[in-house]
A protein has these predicted regions:
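A residue-level detector for short acidic-glycine micro-motifs
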Residues: 14, 51, 83-86, 105-108, ...
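Catalytic cores of extracellular degradative/oxidative enzymes
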Residues: 31-36, 101, 115, 124-128
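Short, charged beta-turn/beta-strand-edge "cap" motif at the junction between a beta-strand
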Residues: 39, 55-57, 103-111
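A structural signal for short beta-strand/turn segments enriched in small hydrophobics and glycine
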Residues: 41, 47-49, 94-106
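Zn2+-dependent peptidoglycan hydrolase active-site motif and core
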Residues: 44-93, 115
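Histidine-centered divalent-metal-coordination microenvironment in nucleic-acid enzymes
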Residues: 112-120
Length: 180
């Protein structure tokens, strides 16, 4: 499911070419959702919290000083929720989370162009700073969100998507990663 609560809608962008080009393309399928600081975020899939950091202030504009929650799924992939607000983690390391459970509050920590959620799913991990994008775990996989329509081929940058109620899960389009 989209990483925010049903009924809410946000504009989505692909991450900047600076990010993907500077890291060998490992962030190819990362998404940025424009949203105000403090927006409740939910787990796109069930899993176990693999990493948490929420100590940096919003607006620090410093690379590798972003707050995050990372959730490892049963298939070994890791969803990353980045740029959270200070004290914005609502879960702790090792917690089991349900799909749709509130896990964090969005923010503007780290090097950003404004408040947003950076969301991606990596093949393994978690990779922690400063090794965020090291291969093989830095490689992201394409995802679709079953509670956002239309998006059979993934979300389209520049469009606003609303999280719908009902069938809510995220599926990986990569052939080696099963749907959730």
């Amino acid at each position: 499911m989209l990483p925010f609560e049903p009924g809410r809608a946000y504009l989505v962008w692909r991450t900047t070419s600076h990010y993907t080009r500077g890291n060998g393309g490992v962030g190819l399928y990362a998404l940025d959702f424009e949203m105000p600081v403090g927006t409740p975020l939910v787990a796109a899939r069930a899993g176990v919290v693999a990493a948490v950091r929420d100590t940096f202030p919003d607006g620090n504009d410093t690379d590798l000083q972003e707050n995050y929650v990372m959730v490892r799924h049963a298939d070994g992939t890791v969803a990353r929720y980045l740029h959270l607000t200070r004290a914005g983690a609502l879960v702790a390391l090792g917690d089991s989370v349900r799909q749709g459970q509130r896990i964090a509050l969005s923010g503007n920590s780290g090097q950003t162009g404004g408040p947003h959620l950076h969301f991606d799913v990596q093949t393994c991990g978690p990779n922690l700073p400063s090794g965020y994008n090291r291969l093989p775990c830095g490689r992201t996989v394409p995802v679709t969100f079953r509670n956002a329509k239309p998006n059979a081929c993934g979300l389209v940058p520049g469009r606003r998507y609303q999280a719908e109620t009902g069938s809510a899960s995220v599926g990986h389009r990569a052939s080696k990663a099963p749907a959730g």
